[in-house]
Amino acid sequence: MKYDLIVVGSGPGGYVAAIRASQLGMNVAVIERAELGGICLNWGCIPTKSLLKSAQVLEYAGHAADYGVKIEHAEPDFDAIIARSRGVADKMSKGIQYLFKKNNITVIEGHGKLTADKKVEVTDAAGEKTVHEAQHIVLATGARSRQLPNIPQD
C-alpha cells in the first residue's frame, strides 16, 4: 500500500504527527507494535501520574484535620489504585484510536523496519510480512536506556 506519510510509532510524537499530517490532507498510516499511545501513555508517564495523584489524595487525607476536615482511617486500596491507573491509560489510548478513525488514519499493527528507499516492512504478530511505501516516513519509536561500561544502572 502507498501513503503520503507513514509514522512508525504511536507515542506522543507519532500520534500528533500523524493527526496533523492527516488534517493537512495527507494519506497517513501509523505502524504500532503494541497499544496506541506507546509506552508513555500505556505504561510510563500517564499511569505514573495517575498513581502519583492517588498518593497525593491520600497525603491530603492525612492532613485534612489541618484544614478543619475530619477524615478517619484513610487507607490505600492498591487494587483500586492500579485499576484507576489502567483505566486512565485505556481511556486515553481509546481517545487516540477515535482521533485516528476521525482523521482517516490507517493503523497497521506490527513491527516496522525500514528496508529500502521510502519503504517499511511490517511484521505482524503471526510473523507475516507486508511492505508499505510512503513519500515521507517519520520514525517516532521512542528510546530505550543503554547500559554504559563502568556505569551501573539503578
Identify the function of each model-found stretch.
Residues 1-11:
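Beta1/beta-strand and adjacent pyrophosphate-binding region of the FAD-binding site
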